């Protein structure tokens, strides 16, 4: 299983992103939609696609923005899949691999991040669970008819993507 985290504030170097014995780095790739200096992901024309342990560790972290000057993404990814950094304190799916998306504050961009995660998981032959632990606002009507809601529903139905959302921050 791959856990995709759509958020801000990822410290790619954090020890919780290794396995419980601190031997294997589990972050597969990140898409920082703010960053330049790396090529964007395939089929997209913005942001930076960073793949592989050495590239991620060299990049160090995602781009700070006004919505998260700290490490919220690292925090919620740790709850979902933290390896424990050699301690007994681990995330729920501590053996899962990870994808991170730091998305621009726009409905289209967050939906792009979901599609990117789906494509990455398919390419690797893995199931995908997407974590959304942000409570800034909702896109569109809150009755299930918004573009956002319909897109999430379709990814869930057509591609068996599981979405997990916090009940608030």
Indicate where each model-derived feature is located.
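Subtilisin-like serine protease catalytic core
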Residues: 1-110, 124-129, 158-160
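Substrate-binding/access-modulating region of protease and related hydrolase catalytic domains
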Residues: 83, 103-169
């Amino acid at each position: 299983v791959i856990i995709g985290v759509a958020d801000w504030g990822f410290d790619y170097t954090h020890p919780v992103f290794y396995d419980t014995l601190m031997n294997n780095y589990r972050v597969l790739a990140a898409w920082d939609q703010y960053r330049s200096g790396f090529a964007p992901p395939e089929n997209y024309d913005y942001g930076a696609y960073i793949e592989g342990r050495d590239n991620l560790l060299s990049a160090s972290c995602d781009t700070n923005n006004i919505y998260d000057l700290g490490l919220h993404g690292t925090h919620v990814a740790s709850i979902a899949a933290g390896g424990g950094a050699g301690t007994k304190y681990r995330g729920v799916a501590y053996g899962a691999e990870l994808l991170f998306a730091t998305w621009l504050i726009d409905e289209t961009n967050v939906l792009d991040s979901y599609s990117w995660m789906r494509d990455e998981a398919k390419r690797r032959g893995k199931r995908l669970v997407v974590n959304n632990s942000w409570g800034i606002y909702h896109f569109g009507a809150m009755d299930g008819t918004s573009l956002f809601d319909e897109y999430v529903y379709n990814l869930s139905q057509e591609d068996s993507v599981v979405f997990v959302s916090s009940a608030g921050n």
